[in-house]
């Protein structure tokens, strides 16, 4: 993953050089349950190593995770046209926690819920236009923060931190829906949203545009994207150019 420098003691201490290494092995199975609905599951083994050769207390760890996904696709009548409506969901990385210090501190995997829907509208026999909306949210509980410096504040923080450290992954998933310090507003801010438009000619040539939004307190990824694609038989090529709407975004003016 490349070299990363970690500052300690507010940047006044020594720099810890990390060379993270991640490996995952997946086995998946999918099945069509009806004419319009299908589901899939995946099992995953994860090997995670922070690569801190100068810190003997940091050790690699293993984790196991699963994904669950569903997809529905059916034709609906809109006006005089037969449109293809689709809906899907995916819950990824439901699994064990990882620890880089031998079990003293346990960290959640980045479990994520994604839901999306789309509508493909036929203009004529060769031209189609589609609109798609996706929403996603991390199913990871908010880590407690110490709010004061009194002995009572420190004791309360330690109790909450121990509870967080010992919380099971499944409990953490359910807790993530209502534990934001900012209440319901904070939960809404954790949702990432994207919308996209796609035009295609004969299912071979594609032109796309979209927008992705993430709250400024959750990562601040906000950008437009424009792209194109080409498909022939089993071969498909897609490319997109990202234009950030916020400053200091490393994704700005990058090609995917």
Protein language model annotation of sequence segments:
Residues 1-256:
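Subset of outer-membrane beta-barrel
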């Amino acid at each position: 993953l490349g070299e990363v420098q970690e500052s300690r003691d507010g940047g006044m201490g020594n720099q810890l050089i990390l060379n993270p290494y991640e490996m995952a092995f997946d086995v998946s199975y999918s099945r069509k349950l009806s004419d319009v609905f299908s589901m899939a599951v995946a099992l995953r083994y994860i090997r995670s190593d922070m690569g801190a050769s100068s810190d003997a207390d940091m050790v690699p760890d293993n984790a196991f995770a699963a994904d669950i996904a569903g997809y529905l696709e059916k034709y609906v009548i809109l006006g005089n046209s037969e449109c293809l409506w689709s809906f899907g969901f995916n819950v990824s990385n439901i699994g064990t926690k990882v620890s880089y210090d031998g079990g003293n501190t346990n960290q959640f995997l980045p479990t994520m819920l994604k839901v999306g829907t789309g509508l493909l509208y036929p203009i004529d026999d060769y031209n189609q236009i589609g609109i798609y909306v996706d929403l996603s949210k991390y199913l990871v509980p908010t880590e407690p923060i110490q709010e004061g410096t009194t002995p009572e504040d420190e004791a309360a923080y330690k109790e909450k931190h121990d509870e967080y450290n010992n919380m099971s992954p499944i409990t953490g998933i359910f807790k993530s829906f209502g534990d934001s310090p900012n209440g319901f507003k904070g939960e809404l801010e954790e949702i990432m949203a994207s919308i996209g438009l796609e035009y295609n000619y004969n299912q071979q040539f594609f032109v796309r545009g979209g927008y992705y939004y993430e709250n400024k307190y959750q990562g601040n990824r906000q950008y437009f994207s424009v792209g194109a694609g080409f498909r022939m038989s089993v071969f498909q090529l897609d490319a997109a150019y990202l234009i950030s709407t916020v400053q200091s975004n490393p994704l700005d003016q990058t090609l995917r």
